[in-house]
Amino acid sequence: DTTKEIVKKTTKLDKNFLIYGEPWKGGNSPLMNGTFKGSQRNENFSVFNDTFRDAIRGDNNPSNGFINGNQHSITCNWSIIEGLKGSIYTLTSNQNESINYADAHDNYTLWDQIEKSQNPSLSQGDYRKNISIYPLDNHFVRQDLLALSILFTAQGIPFIQYGSEFLRTKQGNHNSYNSSDEINSIKWSDKNKFIDIFDYTK
């Protein structure tokens, strides 16, 4: 109800306000009528589409998605098709309610997800070690770019985590809220190192 009231009041001021959030609770709550996936339909706010995220790259176990080995799964393929259409038959009433993403502030970065899903025993410090001076020749880099291409061509609102445009890694830390700056900081030198990926994303 709070979100609905905020939407109602802000759109009176400016119809271009964008209000979005996570359609799930962060834990136990005494509130009985929260907003859950699909219940926001026609309420004029947007939600993170984690079903589309998981179809693209796999869940946070980590598992595989369309880009990294699960492209023959009928369920995965239908979720990709539905996500490309803005999830208007499963999650939203229109595509503007869908925040399309492959990574965000929590869980694995897109790059870490790709590497970890292919090598579960990969250790901290070993991420991005096997990228040559020609990154576009790297199979994992091409998977990363495929994920971004899907996001940017899907109906809905594309969302990327800062640094994803140059293969951001948190060295496999999928829950880094209390980790060091070394893990959480943006390594701006990576923009120059992976300028081809940055330019592709731009």
Question: What positions do the PLM features span?
Answer:
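Extended hydrophobic/aromatic segments used for targeting, binding, or gating
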Residues: 164-202
